[in-house]
Amino acid sequence: MFEQQSPLGSDQDFSAIMNAARHTMPRLLVIDDDNLHRMIICRVAAKAGFLPAGAASYDEAAKLAQETAFDCITLDLSLGNHAGSEMLHHLSMLGSTAPIIVVTGADYATCKETVKVAERLNLDIWECIPKPVDLVMLRHFLERLKASWNTVAVAA
């Protein structure tokens, strides 16, 4: 009998493609405990040329951030039993230099305080985007980040 060939090729071929993509596309960590928001942000990011990885909890995000040097991060400030500020402290302990886009339902004062905390931790918050997410605005910020990443990647 004939084996049907997957249109993606073998699992080994697919892994090779994904490994190559990891070196040519910026990696984005999407931290949001809301499944729908996380999925939407991942899709917008993929369309903007990122390789997104979603984390539904503080623990999952902390593990991913420790295992992978992400080029960019989106962070919800409310992560169930943890605050986004706890994630900022964790990212700082890891020495993360990834630009951060805060995506939150919190008010302006909370966003402003988050930026101050991030600055004290030597983290780089690019923007605070309110929920519900304006997809055009999100894509605009991601495209700016990708252009910045491309400039750095070409210079390296």
Protein language model regions, located:
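Active-site residues of response regulator receiver
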Residues: 76
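Short hydrophobic/Thr-rich beta-strand motif most characteristic of the beta2 strand and flanking loop
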Residues: 49-57, 64, 129
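Acidic catalytic/metal-coordinating carboxylates
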Residues: 57, 83-86
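Conserved acidic carboxylate
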Residues: 32
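Alpha4 helix (beta4-alpha4-beta5 surface) of REC/receiver domains from two-component response regulators
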Residues: 86, 106-128
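The feature encodes the CheY-like receiver
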Residues: 80
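Two-component/phosphorelay signaling modules centered on CheY-like receiver
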Residues: 20, 35-53
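Non-catalytic signal-transmission and effector/linker regions of two-component phosphorelay proteins
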Residues: 1-29, 42, 136-156
